[in-house]
Amino acid sequence: MTKSLLRTIAAAGALAAASFTGAAQAAEAKLGALSFLPNHTAFGKPFADWVGKINGESKGSIQIEIKAPGSMSPFTMGNAVKSGVIDMVHLPHTFYQNLLPIGDAMKLNQKTPKELRANGFIDFMNKLHNEKVNAEYLGHWGLNIPFHIYLRNKKIETADLKGLKLRITPVYRAFFRALGADLIQIPPADVYTALERGTVDGLGWPQWDIKSFGWDKQIKYRVDPGFYGTSEAFLVNLDKWKTLDSKQQAYLKKSFQDMEDEMWEKAKELNAFYAKRQAEAGIQTITFSPEETARYKKVAYEAGWEEALKLDPVNGPKMKELIGGKY
C-alpha cells in the first residue's frame, strides 16, 4: 500500500470521525424552559425535579435549562412558547387563556390522569394546542390539589359572600361572582399588603403554599371544603418538538406520564401536610352544614361550566364530556 493511499485513507477516516462526532452532538436536544413560579416553591419544585430527572437520565440525549425566575411574566409565557421565544413552559392553563380559552376549564376536571389518557382527552387537548398555541401538550399535574377561600378576619356561616372583597383570578371569578362577592384582581406580589391594609377581605388560592408568601400572618380562616383543582400544563413549542427524534419525543412523554401519576398520589399526602401547616399557623377552618356544602359545590361547578361553555361553545361540550363528573 502506497504512502499516498495511506494518507488518503487516514484523511477519509478523520473526516468520517469528525462527521460522526458532529452528528452525535447535533442529536442532543437542548431546550430552554420557564416556570410560572420559582423552583423552590411548592408549585415550582415538581417541575424542577422533573427537569433534573430528565437531565440525569437521558444520557446526553436531552438537556433542559430552566431560565431564571422572573425573567418573564407568567402571563406572557403562553405567547412566548407559541412564538418560539422559549422552548418549554410550565404554567397553569388559565395563564394562557388568551390563546386557548377552554383550557381554563381544566380546573373543573373530575377524572384521574390515567382516565384522561384512556378516554382520548390528551389527544383532544394536544390537537387544540397544536392549532391554537403552536405547542405540543405533554400533559398536566395538580388536578387533585383543591382551591379554597381564605379570609382575613370575617367569619361566615353560609356560602354567601355578599359584602366581601375577594382577590380573584379568572379561575374562580365566575364562582365568587355567583356567591355575591366584590371582585378585586391584583398581582400576587400585592396580596400581602392588600390583606394587611384591608383592601381585600380574603382571596382564593390552592391548599398549598400560602406560607411562602407570608399570607398566613394575615389570614385567620379557610373555608372547607375545597373546590376545583389546580392544573399546571407542560408545553413544548411545536416547531422545537418536531426537531426531536421519535425516541426523544417518546421519552419526554413517558417521563411526564410517570411524573403525572406520581404527583397524583403525592398530592394526597401534601394536601394533608399543608392543611396541618395552616392549622399550626393558627388558621381556623369554616365548615358549612351538609345542605349548604352541597349548594356551595353545586354553584362552583355550575358557574364554572357556564363560563367555560360561553368562552368556547365549539370545544366546550367535548371538554365537559371528557373531564366532567358529579362534583
List each language-model region with its residue ranges:
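Bacterial N-terminal signal peptides that target proteins for export
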Residues: 1-10
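Hydrophobic helical h-region of N-terminal Sec-dependent signal peptides
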Residues: 10-15, 20
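N-terminal secretory/targeting leader peptides
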Residues: 11-13, 26-111, 115, 121, ...
